[in-house]
Structure formats: structure tokens, C-alpha cells
Amino acid sequence: MSKGPAVGIDLGTTYSCVGVFQHGKVEIIANDQGNRTTPSYVAFTDTERLIGDAAKNQVAMNPTNTVFDAKRLIGRRFDDAVVQSDMKHWPFMVVNDAGRPKVQVEYKGEAKSFYPEEVSSMVLTKMKEIAEAYLGKTVTNAVVTVPAYFNDSQRQATKDAGTIAGLNVLRIINEPTAAAIAYGLDKKVGAERNVLIFDLGGGTFDVSILTIEDGIFEVKSTAGDTHLGGEDFDNRMVNHFIAEFKRNDKKDISENKRAVRRLRTACERAKRTLSSSTQASIEIDSLYEGIDFYTSITRARFEELNADLFRGTLDPVEKALRDAKLDKSQIHDIVLVGGSTRIPKIQKLLQDFFNGKELNKSINPDEAVAYGAAVQAAILSGDKSENVQDLLLLDVTPLSLGIETAGGVMTVLIKRNTTIPTKQTQTFTTYSDNQPGVLIQVYEGERAMTKDNNLLGKFELTGIPPAPRGVPQIEVTFDIDANGILNVSAVDKSTGKENKITITNDKGRLSKEDIERMVQEAEKYKAEDEKQRDKVSSKNSLESYAFNMKATVEDEKLQGKINDEDKQKILDKCNEIISWLDKNQTAEKEEFEHQQKELEKVCNPIITKLYQSAGGMPGGMPGGFPGGGAPPSGGASSGPTIEEVD
């Protein structure tokens, strides 16, 4: 295949989306199910691996081996409080591998464990394939988005996931920044505008304030809640109905995973309905112990169940305004991103907060991020279209970065919301006489003391010549590149001795070897998936050939054209094959093909004889036998082929 353009991928917590900039505009690409967003789900079964819709659709039958929310694990340590609290809610198992979380599943009858990067890489591979199927070209270059909140290690791990998926990640950009680009292209204005981006997705909530002037974006502030989104609203509804079921039927379904999962799917559907209708009905047959569950919910009740969560979305809005040092009257535009911003109550709360100001909903909220990422991908890969030419992107660091100085004080070198790439240098000295070395501990966070902030990594600079305290000069440099990856170095001015760290190590970064290995494994899994597809198609081919052949010889139009002995011979062989198939559903492709050849050996001579004696097609059937497809041509192409539906 020829090389395709660069794409933009919104790798979401619950759903992902891919877009491409071509012919002067962005196209959001639908997957094979016709959906423009794809669930960030990967499932493992006894026979195959499923990604996307196919994985999400079977989650009720296979909850412990269906992995989602990898984005909540990526770039985190196992003992991270977030990981520990999230684990309680996941049906799949998360295990501790040398301090790093891995998800453990059963695949083809064996226990397998995967790093979050590997799971995310599977979703990215799916998005890459969706783009390739649409473009008819191979896709390697991509811009991938992350929440503004992501720290360094989460960004790096996301980039690694891209590498494992066989992508060249041109840049990692913030989701709100991407949405701003999508927006900036649509509305070119001369004067400076302050834009607030309100992004409420399936699992995360981000508020960002940007200024846009003459095609230049600057991010002024970011705030949000990494744990608020559509799923939380679903949960409130689920709990409401569990309680209702308890009241009416005196049964507690909460311990039954499958029942809860079916209820949740129905609730998600009802929630979507409530964005356009004032009430929705829920009908689930035999939800629990044979009891049907038929009920309904009004929009008002849904809003009441989520009242605190909905209202709570305004707190980060206020915080972002404070950080940007802006009053709400100074915001020119409010942009809605994320499917949950379709909820009328949320739109109303936001509109009232901004004193009745109109909200921008012109961009499909599910697609805005991928849209902007696609534009950015075009810019970075040198698209010369005037639509993207004069767009420049300035991203920021989400948290302040600094080092610990005497007494556990956080000394900030790079303030939060500093535009990146950036480089800051500051000179430090020793704290005691003849001190031989210094420990440089790098932290991120806004608190005055390092113990309240997050340790990113540390290293020692040793070999400082003996000197009284305060004499040695140690120059510390913080350097953040365009992807938000941080390098910290320290140099002793007297000796020129240097040591440095790329902040990633202590967060459980994957090593080069790990990534190489995972790339190979990803290839292997992909090959296995292909093999599985081939196997299924040769099985289907054999099955349809046997059934069609049976139907053909039993057709009354052939009565008298075929002698009973031949007919019986074919029927016996077909029945033998059909019963073999029932017992050998999981046989290898070669076995299915062998069985088909055996069957053809019996059938072909008889069918050929039939033609010759009939002098052409029997019963005026120029197109072949009824139900028999075209005359068998041997191999996997015999019998009508049915397109697989994943």
C-alpha cells in the first residue's frame, strides 16, 4: 500500500476517534460498524482477541477478560492511590509487576498479563486500521492527544503505546488544545479572544482557558477532575434502578455482574435518549432470576440523581478562571467538548454561570479533539494548505516543576501553565561544609513543601571538591520539549561534572527492550487475529458447502435426475461432515480445507455426471443448482461466501 497522510487520534478513556485532514478539510473516519467513535475496549476470549465495538458488545458474557479504562492506568505506579481506588470498580484483574500495574486476563485458555501501554497500543492499532481501511493507504504518522492533566510519565507512556502500535507519534498534544485548534480553524478572528473549553467525556473532565490571536493559541490555565464523566452519570442511574428493583422485587441484583452490566448498558442508552426526550423507558427481559425489568425514567429524575455532579462541574470552571486571572465576563467563547456536554442540564448550568452567554456547539463534541489532532498532524507533516498554514500552537505544562531544597521546600523552576517547549536554569549551592555531593529531587505540584507534591525522580551529583558551604555553584537546568518530556541536568561549575535524568524512570517507564518486545508481541497478536479470521472463513466455507450440497440433492427438481445410490452417498458424506463440524468447531484451517476436499471428492463426480446426462443445467437452471451456489470450484471459494460481521 502507498503511504497515507498523518492522522489525528483522540485516545479516550472510554471511546477513541480518528480523523484525517485531506482535500482542505478534516474527515472523521467511521469504523467498520459505521460508528465515528470506537470503544477503547480490548477483549480476550478462548479463540480470539477483539478490539472496539466487538469487545464492548460481548462484555456482559466475558467481563473478567474485557479490559477498558487503560488510560486510567497508563504511566502510573501500582500503589498510586488512583490505581488502588479504580481497581475496586473494575471486573478485570490488575496485578503488581515490580511496582507497575498490569492487567491479567485469560486468553486462549492461558493466563496473560499486559502493561497498560500494550492495551492502549491495541486500541491505537485499531484506530490506525480504521484509518487505513478508509484511506486505502498505510498510516504511520499520528498526533495523539492526552488530557491536560497528564503528567510527564503518562505522556511518555502514551507515546510508547503509539510506538508499540507501529505508529510514529509526531506529537502528544493536550485534548483541550486540540479542541481549540478545531475551533480556531472554523473561526479566524483578528482580535485576541479568550476561549473556555469545557470537556466532559466518558471518564474525565477538563476545563481549559486559551487565548487565540491571529492563529496563535496560548493555553492560560487548565483545571478539572480526572474522575468525572458520562460513566458516573450512568452509575447514578444504575444505583437508582438497583434500589427500585430491591423495593419492587425484594431482590438485590448488585452482586450479579451480568445483571448489573445489562442494566448499565440500558442506562447508558436511556441517558442518551434523555438528551433529546424528556423521558426514556428501560425494558430488560429476565434481568435477574427470570424477573423482567420494565421501567422508565424522566429527564427531571435523571438530573436530580446527578444534581451534585452536574453542579460540581462549575468548580473547575471557577478555578480555571482564577488561574488565568480572568473574570467570567472576559470569556469570549465557550466551547463544548465530550459527549456528556450534550446533556441539557449541563449546558444550562454553564450558560447560566456565564450569564446567558451562547455556547459553541458547532463542532460535534465527540469529534472535536480528533478533529484538532488531525489538523495538527497535517501541520506537523508539512501540509501546505492555506487553511492550516498560519496556525501556531503553544502548549503548556499542567503542573509546576521544581526541586527540593533545604528543609523540604519546593523550589519551582518552571511554573505551571508555562508555554512549552521551555528551558529554565537556576544556580544552587551546598548546605554544609565539604559536602561531597548533592541529591537533586525533582517534584511536580503546587504545594510549598515537597512532601505534599509528587516526586518525579531523583539523581545525585557527586564528586564536588571539598569547600565551605555556599561556595560550590551547581547549575540546575529544566528542559521540557514539545511533547512535554522533561530533562533535568545538574552541573558543578568548578569541575564541569554533570549528571542528568529524563523524568520517566521512577514512574515505571518502559525500557527500550520492553518496547521492542511489545512491538513484536503486538505483531504476533495481530497475526493470530488474522489466522483466526482465516480459520473461521474456511470453517464457514466447509459448513455452507455441506449444507448447500445436501439441499441440492434433496431438491425435488432433481427427482429422477440423480440415482438413489448417488444421492445417498452424498447425503451420508454431508451428514458425516456436519457432525464432524459440530465436534470440531475449533479445528485448524488446514483440517477444514482437508474435509472440504474429501467432500468434494465424493460430490464432484456425481454432480458432473448429472450435468452431462442432463445436457446442461437441470430444470432450466442456467445459474447452477438451487441453494447450491455456483458449481463448486474447489478450495475455500466454494459455496456462497458470507461476509463476517465482527
Swiss-Prot record:
Nucleotide-binding domain (NBD): annotated segments: 2-386
Chain segments carrying region Disordered = 614-646
Q: For ADP, which residues are the binding ones?
A: T14, Y15, G202, E268, K271, S275, G339
**What are the N-acetylserine sites (modified residues) in this protein?**
S2
Its membrane topology is listed as: Peripheral membrane protein
Q: Which GO terms describe its biological process?
A: clathrin coat disassembly; mRNA processing; negative regulation of DNA-templated transcription; protein targeting to lysosome involved in chaperone-mediated autophagy; RNA splicing
Which residues are reported to carry the modification Phosphoserine? Answer: S153, S329, S362, S541
Q: What induces it?
A: Constitutively synthesized.
One Pfam family of this chain: HSP70
Against SUPFAM superfamilies, the record matches this protein to:
Actin-like ATPase domain, Heat shock protein 70kD (HSP70), C-terminal subdomain, Heat shock protein 70kD (HSP70), peptide-binding domain
Residue ranges of the region described as Interaction with BAG1 = 186-377
As annotated, the Glycyl lysine isopeptide (Lys-Gly) (interchain with G-Cter in SUMO2) covalent link is placed at K512
Family, per entry? Belongs to the heat shock protein 70 family.
Record text about domains = The N-terminal nucleotide binding domain (NBD) (also known as the ATPase domain) is responsible for binding and hydrolyzing ATP. The C-terminal substrate-binding domain (SBD) (also known as peptide-binding domain) binds to the client/substrate proteins. The two domains are allosterically coupled so that, when ATP is bound to the NBD, the SBD binds relatively weakly to clients. When ADP is bound in the NBD, a conformational change enhances the affinity of the SBD for client proteins.
What is the recorded name of this protein? Heat shock cognate 71 kDa protein
Give the source species.
Cricetulus griseus (Chinese hamster)
Which gene carries the instructions for this protein? HSPA8
